[in-house]
Regions:
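Active-site-proximal alpha-helix that buttresses catalytic centers in soluble enzyme cores
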Residues: 1-45
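Active-site catalytic microenvironments for nucleophilic, acid-base chemistry
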Residues: 12, 37-41, 108, 112, ...
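Glycine-rich phosphate-binding loop signature in dinucleotide/nucleotide-binding domains
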Residues: 16-19, 109-117
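Short beta-strand scaffold positions
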Residues: 25-26, 100, 121-122
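Short, active-site-adjacent cap segments at secondary-structure transitions
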Residues: 30-32, 55-56, 126-128
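Phosphate-handling substructures
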Residues: 40-101, 157
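Generic beta-sheet signal
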Residues: 116-124
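Domain-level recognition of soluble alpha/beta enzyme cores
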Residues: 135-160
Length: 160
């Protein structure tokens, strides 16, 4: 399903006549493969792996079923329409830390690609914090009011 979604995304980008100068991706397999499929379909060079695009470190929640989130993390959770977010499990990256990482991504892209359009293939939580940083929206508001699914296009967002 993921590869099919990536091919559909590439068609959608072509249909919208979006043009990208570079593609960056999380080094994790699924996001990187998605970026590679899209880059190839668009005639772009291979994606560049960028460690700051990796998904949030979930600490003790890593590998646990979503159903366990409330039991383990309550009351430090935020429930949104499609997702429950845990805020402070042991060893996890906090959303303020993730927001700072999102800002680092934007700063890096602005330095490396001034006046260019860059496609980022990343994961949900870091994607939301990049969006929060780019739009100066409070991170809690982004978690509750903003949702994007696999291979959704968010943007373009001008960060110059």
């Amino acid at each position: 399903m993921g590869r099919q979604q990536a091919r559909q995304l590439a068609r959608h980008i072509k249909d919208r006549e979006l043009v990208f100068d570079a593609v960056y991706a999380s080094p994790l397999d699924r996001a990187f493969e998605t970026a590679a499929i899209v880059a190839t379909a668009l005639g772009l060079t291979e994606p560049i792996a960028h460690d700051d695009l990796i998904e949030r470190d979930f600490g003790i929640m890593t590998g646990k079923p979503a159903a366990d989130i409330e039991a383990i993390c309550a009351p430090d959770i935020i429930k949104a329409e499609n997702v429950t977010y845990f805020l402070h499990p042991d060893g996890a990256e906090t959303f303020p830390e993730l927001l700072a990482r999102g800002q680092r991504v934007l700063d890096f892209m602005t330095r490396q690609h001034p006046d260019q359009t860059v496609l980022l293939a990343c994961h949900g939580d870091i994607g939301k914090m990049i969006y929060a940083a780019a739009t100066s929206t409070p991170w809690r508001q982004v978690l509750t009011d903003f949702y994007f699914g696999n291979t959704d296009i968010v943007g373009p967002v001008d960060v110059s």
